[in-house]
Swiss-Prot record:
The keyword Iron does not apply. The keyword Transferase applies. This is Thiosulfate sulfurtransferase GlpE. Gene3D superfamilies: Rhodanese-like domain. GO terms for biological process: glycerol metabolic process. Residues 15-103 form the Rhodanese domain. One of its GO terms (cellular component) is cytoplasm. It is found in: Cytoplasm. The active site is at C63 (cysteine persulfide intermediate). Belongs to the GlpE family. GO terms for molecular function: thiosulfate-cyanide sulfurtransferase activity.
């Protein structure tokens, strides 16, 4: 089993249906701005993530440009998560699609 790639617009639509979007960018970038409703997934927050998501939950992985999200998506599949997606274009693609973001500015 592997993950699928989806567009930012598809990710947003899936989030409206209950999918979990995890943002794997660094702490400073995530704190500054991130997709609205995203969970910040780090090594330190993984246990909290495991409490939030079950193995059948749709999980969308977002990074900077859509490259490193593939590695994390593969890792999640290897951990037993069955419904994993990597977001094409990452947060840059999300912003280009003019989808909602949470910011600190």
């Amino acid at each position: 089993m592997s993950f699928k790639e989806i567009t930012p617009q598809q990710a947003w639509e899936m989030m409206q249906q209950g999918a979990i979007l995890v943002d794997i960018r660094d702490n400073m970038r995530f704190a500054y701005s991130h997709p609205k409703g995203a969970f910040h997934l780090t090594n330190q927050s993984f246990l909290q993530f495991e409490e939030l998501a079950d193995f059948d939950s749709p999980i969308i992985v977002s990074c900077y440009h859509g490259v490193s999200s593939r590695n994390v998506a593969t890792f999640l599949v290897e951990q037993g998560y069955k419904n994993v997606f990597s977001m094409i274009g990452g947060f840059d693609g999300w912003c280009r699609a003019e989808l909602p973001i949470d910011t600190t500015y």
